[in-house]
Amino acid sequence: MAPTGGGTLAAVHPIERLRYVARASGVDQSLLVQETASALGAFGADPAGMVTACRRIVHRHPACGALWWLCGRVLTAGDPMPEAWRAADEIDADRTAVELAHALPDDATACVLGWPDLVGEALPRRGDVEALVVDVLGEGSGLVRRLLAADVEAVDVATQGLGAAAAAADVVVLEASAVGPDAFVGVAGSRAAAAVARHDGRPVWLVAGVGRLVPQRVWDALSGLVDAAAEPWEADDELVPLALVDQVVGPTGPQPVADALKRTDCPIAAELLVDL
């Protein structure tokens, strides 16, 4: 990927691009990383400005593990911009959705919440799988329409049916926006779905793509910001113990949790760990 390559905001000035990224919500992590990498190009000759820009981005999107990963790589690199583009290329080449599509059991019924980026990319590849899509944050209905258009059997489940859907599924497939050493950030309802599945003996798979696993110090800062964003019962995201997860699906396929955590590769940039 070249710094001058096309993108959704290719003709926009980098400063305006950065403002867009900071304001964006409901945008998938891949796009956020690509647009942030491009926007940071405006600060190539301004190290202090780059630090401030990175801090503002991760504080605006604290649940986005891939942005912490990108900004950590940029701020700890000897040559920041080539590192930013390498990170964007790695996100673009992420095989997690492909591996998830391959790994799902034949003719399985999968319970998913909302419209997760990678899960939503994987399911249309599997016409034999039925999806019970819980309409969390009002996003599930859109995924159901997408799946039906791809000839994938899908059921639009109201939020009050979350527990029943988790108990009825062959596998509960959750997606992490960030993963720490002992917990992950998932969409609201993830903890309840995982707990019901565990109680009923259903496997819980956690989907965590490139850049979403972070070390303890970064996790402490990230999870603290997520916790402080809203009252727990009003938040769009929540912290879920990894003890409720059976397998983590990443770019090399499903792994036990302990093995998956070994691919944590987010650098620790001290500049990101202080309050704005």
Label each PLM-derived region with a short phrase.
Residues 36, 40, 119-123, 143, ...:
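Buried hydrophobic packing segments
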Residues 120-146:
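Catalytic core of membrane glycerolipid acyltransferases/transacylases, capturing the structured
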Residues 51-52, 56-128:
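Long amphipathic N-terminal alpha/beta scaffold segment
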Residues 112-115, 134, 175-176:
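Short His-Asn-centered micro-motif
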Residues 136-276:
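Conserved phosphate- and dinucleotide-binding cores of soluble alpha/beta proteins
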Residues 43-49, 78-79, 128, 200-203, ...:
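Short helix-capping/linker segments at secondary-structure and domain boundaries
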Residues 3-86:
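Long amphipathic alpha-helical segments
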